């Protein structure tokens, strides 16, 4: 096994790692060969100097090589955020994923429990009755039958256990906050990816381009890792191998601007109840912002040509009950787990 010490020294001296060296470093971290001090020192040296595109590509390559894969259709999309925006909103990408599934576009959603908020995707889905601890075959069935499957990060990235304690002890953001959303176990090549800071918009679009993604929007909206209805959403879009940047406002989606307080959520149980209310017909700011994110996903996937058309398709999936049916089917199929599928 290669040595981590010279790579730590290199980063500590302000130098950047090439992709090969970054891959080597993260192979060492993920194999359990590094000490807690080495892990903490390396992660903080990267953080203080600033992670580069090549370093993230190398790290993601290491993550992907070790993940437990899931089979999904080629046109599947992932709607995911880095988390870490510290705002504590409702589970927007979760509801957007359910709506998107209701339109007939398959969603291979990757996520985790809350880290900095009260409710991550896993918390809300668990409260809705979705079983999380299921194997790849059953997740693939969920995607095929419900149009939506959830891949619980800790089930698919077991090598992360080697760095978990150090991350907790550091108590601050590291490169790993970026790696999860870039390491979808279903290999989804289409993504709506929300980031906690606008500085990561173009770099992460470049990372995903270099890793073979096809159609991606990396978004940041008014402090949130989502398309927002409270102000301007900044977008870096990967289309046909090229990256372009643009801004969106609520007007582009045909919705009224919202106040941030109208989007503040609670814990998993409270957020699950709010999500069910929208599926049952409640019209509020949570509905609007989730529709906007679903609409963005439809445009990314080529299921709609314009945001206006996409909003119509997404609204129909919600109002017709197709989105609610997708969730109900996800709950049913995920709970069919037996000892052979654990």
From Swiss-Prot:
Binding site for Mg(2+) 2: 225-226
Pfam families: Glycos_trans_3N, Glycos_transf_3
Keywords linked to the UniProt accession: Amino-acid biosynthesis, Aromatic amino acid biosynthesis, Glycosyltransferase, Magnesium, Metal-binding, Transferase, Tryptophan biosynthesis
EC number: 2.4.2.18
Bound cofactor: record note: Binds 2 magnesium ions per monomer.
Binding site for anthranilate 1: 81, 112
Biological processes, Gene Ontology terms: L-tryptophan biosynthetic process
Record-level Gene Ontology MF annotations: anthranilate phosphoribosyltransferase activity; magnesium ion binding
Pathway info: Amino-acid biosynthesis; L-tryptophan biosynthesis; L-tryptophan from chorismate: step 2/5
Entry binding sites for Mg(2+) 1: 93, 226
Cofactor names: Mg(2+)
UniProt binding sites for 5-phospho-alpha-D-ribose 1-diphosphate: 81, 84-85, 89, 91-94, 109-117, 121
Enzyme's top EC category: transferase
Cellular component GO terms, alphabetical: cytosol
Reactions catalysed: N-(5-phospho-beta-D-ribosyl)anthranilate + diphosphate = 5-phospho-alpha-D-ribose 1-diphosphate + anthranilate
Binding site for anthranilate 2: 167
InterPro entries named in the record: Anthranilate_Pribosyl_Tfrase, Glycosyl_Trfase_fam3, Glycosyl_Trfase_fam3_N_dom, Glycosyl_Trfase_fam3_N_dom_sf, Nuc_phospho_transferase
Quaternary structure and interacting proteins, as annotated: Homodimer.
Family recorded in the similarity comment: Belongs to the anthranilate phosphoribosyltransferase family.
Alphabetized HAMAP family for the sequence: TrpD
Function: Catalyzes the transfer of the phosphoribosyl group of 5-phosphorylribose-1-pyrophosphate (PRPP) to anthranilate to yield N-(5'-phosphoribosyl)-anthranilate (PRA).
Name listed for the protein in its UniProt record: Anthranilate phosphoribosyltransferase
Organism name: Agrobacterium fabrum (strain C58 / ATCC 33970)
Gene this chain is encoded by: trpD
